[in-house]
């Protein structure tokens, strides 16, 4: 009986570990998707452009300022230390790490079509963001 329990434990633990690893990589992607939806919605509701600043260690969502000197509220998400990402713009041939990239959402709801590659160790998830809906499209992944 003990042998059967040991076998079940050995078989069940690797899939559970795999799910935890995938969740650690999916969390920042879900946050980015939330930022994109919020930026699109707010841009259309307020009839002004919003931007998501894609920094090395975080994302910041804020309205695009027009030299008014005023400060607007913003949302921020800090990436976990072991997760990195790179982006590929429509005109790029390959992914590139950019220290301070801007992703602009116009008042008509459109955004620049970007492809993202998130990595954690040797695990990765790649996806494209639809410029009309700001939703994730064509996702590919490799999780050990």
Question: Model-found features: residue ranges?
Answer:
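Alpha-helical hydrophobic helix detector
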Residues: 1-14
């Amino acid at each position: 009986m003990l042998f059967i329990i040991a076998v079940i434990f050995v078989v069940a633990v690797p899939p559970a570990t795999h799910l935890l690893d995938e969740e650690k990589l999916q969390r920042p992607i879900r946050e980015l998707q939330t930022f994109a939806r919020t930026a699109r919605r707010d841009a259309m509701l307020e009839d002004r452009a919003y931007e998501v600043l894609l920094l090395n260690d975080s994302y910041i969502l804020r309205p695009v300022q027009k030299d008014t000197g005023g400060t607007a509220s913003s949302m921020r998400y800090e990436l976990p230390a072991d997760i990195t990402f790179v982006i590929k713009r429509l005109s790029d041939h390959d992914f590139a790490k950019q220290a301070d990239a801007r992703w602009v959402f116009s008042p008509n709801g459109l955004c620049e079509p970007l492809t993202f590659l998130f990595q954690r160790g040797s695990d990765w998830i790649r996806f494209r963001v639809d410029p009309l809906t700001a939703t994730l499209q064509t996702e590919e992944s490799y999780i050990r």
